[in-house]
């Protein structure tokens, strides 16, 4: 398995990072399943499975937030001191292009990345920036206006709501 080789390679001095840290521990096989999918998708697109890519992907899928490149960079550089923010950002954008992540953009904020590839929508707090995933059949069923339907092919419906989260609303 290529991921195992990447993690155990002599160039990867922190394999315990990916296997021993509690925030990286697997719940119900999900991380292992996602890593196998990661390996398969990378191979399909001709990408090498490097320890840095594995670390970036594991940070992304283990995050309860929708992390920015800076957030992931700050975590990964603890283990890869020479990794650059540009490398992390380009890697995350590559993950988006090959279908391993989605980009969540909002007005004026840096791009945030979402490993949840299932259909869902987002709520973003305009004060603290927290992003929460939610599902809604009514939003999924939104009708496409005829003026758009005649000119475009809609591939995905994503609703992005903005407001105040419960903590910020209480302030």
Please give the residue ranges for each predicted region.
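Non-DNA-binding regulatory cores of transcription-related proteins
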Residues: 97-171
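Short amphipathic alpha-helical elements of helix-turn-helix/winged-helix folds
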Residues: 41, 58-63, 75
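Pre-recognition alpha-helix immediately N-terminal to the DNA-recognition helix
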Residues: 54-59, 71
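Basic amphipathic alpha-helical segments that dock to polyanions
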Residues: 88-98
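DNA-recognition alpha helix
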Residues: 69-80
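Short capping segments at the starts of secondary-structure elements
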Residues: 49, 63-68
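Short, Lys/Arg-enriched N-terminal segment that forms or immediately precedes the first helix
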Residues: 32-46
């Amino acid at each position: 398995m290529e991921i195992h080789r990447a993690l155990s390679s002599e160039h990867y001095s922190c394999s315990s990072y990916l296997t021993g840290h509690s925030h990286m521990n697997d719940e119900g096989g999900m991380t292992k399943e996602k890593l196998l999918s990661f390996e398969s998708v990378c191979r399909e697109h001709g990408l090498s499975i490097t320890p840095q890519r594995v670390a970036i992907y594991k940070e992304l899928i283990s995050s309860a937030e929708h992390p920015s490149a800076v957030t992931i960079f700050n975590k990964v550089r603890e283990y890869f001191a020479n990794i650059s923010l540009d490398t992390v950002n380009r890697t995350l954008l590559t993950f988006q292009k090959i279908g391993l992540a989605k980009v969540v953009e909002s007005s004026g904020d840096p791009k945030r990345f979402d490993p949840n590839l299932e259909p869902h929508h987002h709520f973003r707090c305009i004060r603290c920036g927290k992003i929460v995933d939610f599902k809604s059949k009514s939003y999924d069923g939104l009708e496409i206006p005829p003026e758009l339907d005649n000119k475009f092919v809609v591939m995905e419906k994503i609703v992005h709501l903005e407001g105040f989260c419960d903590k910020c609303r209480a302030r």
